[in-house]
Amino acid sequence: MKIKITAEEGQYNAHDAYMHFERQKWAELRDNVELTLSEDDLRQLQGINESLSIQEVIDIYLPLSRLLNLYVKTQQRRHTVRDKFLNSKNENVPYIIGIAGSVAVGKSTTARILQAILSHWPEHPRVALVTTDGFLRPNRELVARNIMHKKGFPESFDTKALIDFVAAIKSGKELISAPIYSHLTYDILPDKKLHLEKPDIVILEGLNVLQSASNYPDHPQRTFVSDFVDFSIFVDAETQLLKKWYVQRFLKFRKGAFTDPKAYFHSYSQMEETQAIDISEKIWDEINGVNLEENIRPTRDRANLILTKATDHQVDSVHLRK
C-alpha cells in the first residue's frame, strides 16, 4: 500500500521552506523498498562512535534512497529528452549528492550507507564516494601559511582544485582522480589517488560542500562546490551533542588509531584519560566549535534535506525542502 503524505501533514511552519517529518512518518515513505544490507554490512559501515542499527537504515535511509532514486531517474529522463531534441546520443553526466555537517555528526557513515544502498538500484549501479578532506592543503603548506590551527576552515582547502574536480565530473570526463587524505598521518597521501571512472552518482562528503557566495559576500571567488551539487543533505544535531560525540570519538581514537607509532596524534595515546578529555574539549572549543558556528551551520538552510539526530546518534526528524 502506498503512503501519501500531503504538504499540510509535512510542513511544520507555514513560513518555513521545509516540510517536517517525525521519524515514524518518514519511515512510512519507504514504500516496500527492500533492505539489501546484512548485519555484517552494517558493521563495516559504522562510524567510530555510532551504533548503527538495521532499524535506522530501514526507517531513515531506505526512504531517502527511494527519494534519491526518483531524483536521479528524473535527471536521466531529462537527458533522454535532450538527446531526442539534439537527435544525437550524449553521455549522461553523474548526479552529485552533497553531504555536509559538523565534525563528529556522522557524515561519513551517512555517505557510506547511501553509497551501499544506492549502488543496489539497477538504474545507477556505479556510485562513487569522495570526501573533501582530500582537498585540504598539505600540512607543510598550512604551516607555511600559519593556518595549521585553522585546519577544516575554508582557507585550509585548495578550493580551486576541489572546484576543478567537481567541474570535471559535471563535464562528463570519463576518468577523474582525487587526492586521498589520511586521518592516521593527518595529511594528504602524496603518492595515492582515488580514481573515478564514469560513475552514475558521486557522493561528495565534507564540511564545505554547501558553502556558497551568500556565505562569503566579500569573497572574490564566485564559483563554489555547491553550484555543482544536484541534491544536498545536511546532517545536524545540537551543539552540546556534537561536542560530546567529538570527545567520545577522540577517546576511542586514543585507545585505537592513536596507538599506531605512525599516527600524527600518537602522543595523545600516552595521556591520562582526564588530560585527553581536557585536550579534546579545548580542540572543540577553539577549532571545531568555532568552525561549526562560523562556516558550517550557516549553510544548513541551503540543503535540500536535513537529517536531525538525537542523543543516541539516531535520526529523529527529517526536513525536506518544499
From Swiss-Prot:
GO terms for cellular component: cytoplasm. Pathway: Cofactor biosynthesis; coenzyme A biosynthesis; CoA from (R)-pantothenate: step 1/5. It is found in: Cytoplasm. It catalyses: (R)-pantothenate + ATP = (R)-4'-phosphopantothenate + ADP + H(+). It is an enzyme of class 2 (transferase). One of its GO terms (biological process) is coenzyme A biosynthetic process. One of its GO terms (molecular function) is ATP binding. Its EC number is 2.7.1.33. ATP binds at G101, S102, V103, A104, V105, G106, K107, S108. Keywords: ATP-binding, Coenzyme A biosynthesis, Cytoplasm, Kinase, Nucleotide-binding, Transferase. Belongs to the prokaryotic pantothenate kinase family. This is Pantothenate kinase. It comes from Psychromonas ingrahamii (strain DSM 17664 / CCUG 51855 / 37). The gene is coaA.
